[in-house]
Amino acid sequence: MTKLRTEDLTRILRAYPRAGSTELCARLNGINRATLTRALKTLGDAVIVRGESRRTRYALRRPLRGNAAPIALYRIDEHGQGREIGQLSFTFPEGAALSFEETFPWPLDGGMADGWFDGLPYVVNDMRPQGFLGRNFAHARALDLGVSDNPDEWSDDDVAHVLATTGYDQPGDLILGEAAYRRFLDYVRIGADRFLAESEVETSYLQSAENAMRHGDAGSSAGGEFPKFTASRLVNGRKVDVITKFSGVDDSPAVRRWSDLLVCEHLASLTLPRMLHVSSADSAIHRYGGRTFLEVVRFDRHGDFGRSPVCTLSSLNAALIGTGGGAWPKTARMLQAAGWLSDTDAAKVALIWWFGRLIANTDMHDGNLAFRPGLALAPAYDMLPMAYAPMRGGELPNREFSPDPPLPADAPTWRQAAEASVYFWNICAEDTRISAEFRRICDDNARKMAALLARMQ
């Protein structure tokens, strides 16, 4: 094949990614398949091939920051042992291709089954730094990594670069890139003694909170989000990794309310399994140095270094459904109809969502619901009455609690969730770790909810 024809093939592959041989031959002025095959061989590793037989497609390899080599994808198992499970490559003009070294445990729709993705593979995208911890990381490392200090502005290429360079401790069980995996090995080498004894927790937590506020987003609570840090603990002899949220240190009305909400989140995590038989993340409340700390056990971490897979509804929805958020039960029904979500877990999603509605949780975005492979519902988390969170500037909202009655089809689920919400509001009203003012609100809400439930029986 002439040099010009090679350039023509490169041009067509750039313009028409994931084209099959029939399409490529047609776009190259009707050349035959033998000529195409020779041309593809000439381009060598510059061409990515995925799929078998009639599903075979071709794309032109795109470098990531000047490096066109595939990036290894590793998995860490529950015992802390790692292995390579695939290789990630980037394609022109955008998107990625993933080779699978073993069975992929997450749903794959359409071309994803052959390894083609419009952006990053959704389980990799789910690892991206975000929220308070992500912003703290970006503020600290943006200059070194050549990315914006706002992770919301990162492109897929930025995310891949950051993960492949530094992402050894992201949510779930995956690590992207050899450099990040070597960081994990360093972590294993020096991190076995990281677990805090009970006697060390107070000092460590107070220092971690101070560090988070000094180096992080000091306006987080004002913006409707708890500041937080990660830690490793010995709890009754058990090694656990935790995410710890904390309140401010003064006695202002806004800080008291944030403290109240942390206790409410802990009580909601107790209510879900007790009243609805829905698993929730283990949690505990601590009071140190004028701050309230909510310690939430990570369900994707096990023992010294073990990990397990997890993916949020946000990434699953974007990749498989594309509804862009909305009510969890609606998205769950769509996953159920596609055969990815069981009837049992779809029903549990509806229960969790209605419970959230009836405890005034106005922050049930798709990032606050997660799944394990299968898709099996992961323990619930971030469930609290966010309608009562202080507004930006610290003013407390004066909101009337007006719970929604259900449509007939939702009535059985609603009643179960309503009974659980009455229980929740009552235990909040009785918990002296919550301020007297907010306990009165909780008591009033329990009465309103009980009255509505009685009318709906």
Which residues make up each language-model segment?
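Phosphate/dinucleotide-binding and metal-coordinating scaffold of catalytic cores
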Residues: 1-8, 14-23, 27-457
